[in-house]
């Protein structure tokens, strides 16, 4: 195992994820000092935010995020969210490489950067998912341009329902779901890095030390 290459991977991954999370916080109305430019407003059975109608679920998660930023700091919340997505997506990759899970993040093809988790759902093969999420997903699947939204809902559901992921890391905080980077599926995003990295060799995935080394390098 080449730890120098693992360090390069972890460093690059952290930079990509932190940039994505910070951008997401900005899109949700948070300034670098933790103050907000706008808050969602409840209306009837839902809410509005930045001129758009949003769900009660979004409103509740945004308020939870605002509370976390106020109680701690925006920098700490951003770090937590980036690492949450790092460790879970890396763990999923390790499970797949060891035959403990079906392919999730791998692409349907190199010409179309759509993860198999999404393409399978588009073909009617859904992961375990609660009724409310299934209703939202069914609406999203009517529009192939909403790949990011489809992936966000599916990967959150996958993490909640996978017993190994839950045993290792626990459940994802509700507000962390809002901070999944919107560029995570783009060319150069974190999923792209996972699928194309040369820093992690095939034999590395079979080593029980891999996740420990990546954690150490990520936080260093």
Where do the PLM segments sit?
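Preference for the N-terminal adenyl/adenosyl cofactor-binding alpha/beta module
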Residues: 1-220
């Amino acid at each position: 195992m080449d730890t120098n290459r693992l360090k390069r991977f972890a460093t690059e991954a952290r930079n990509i994820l932190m940039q994505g999370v910070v951008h997401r916080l900005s899109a949700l109305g948070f300034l670098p000092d933790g103050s907000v430019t706008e808050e969602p407003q409840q209306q009837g059975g839902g809410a509005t935010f930045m001129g758009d109608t949003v769900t009660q679920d979004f409103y509740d998660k945004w308020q939870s995020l605002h509370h976390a930023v106020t109680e701690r700091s925006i920098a700490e919340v951003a770090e937590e969210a980036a690492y949450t997505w790092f460790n879970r997506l890396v763990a999923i990759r390790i499970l797949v490489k060891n035959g403990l899970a079906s392919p999730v993040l791998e692409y349907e093809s190199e010409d179309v950067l759509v993860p198999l988790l999404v393409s399978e759902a588009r073909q009617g093969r859904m992961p375990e998912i609660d009724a409310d999420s299934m209703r939202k997903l069914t609406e999203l699947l009517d529009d192939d341009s909403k790949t990011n939204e489809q992936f966000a809902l599916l990967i959150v559901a996958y993490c909640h329902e996978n017993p190994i992921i839950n045993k290792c890391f626990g459940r994802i905080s509700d507000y962390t779901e809002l901070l999944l980077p919107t560029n995570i599926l783009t060319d150069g995003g974190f999923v792209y890095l996972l699928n194309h990295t040369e820093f992690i060799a095939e034999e590395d995935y079979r080593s029980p030390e891999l996740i420990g080394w990546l954690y150490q390098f990520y936080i260093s």
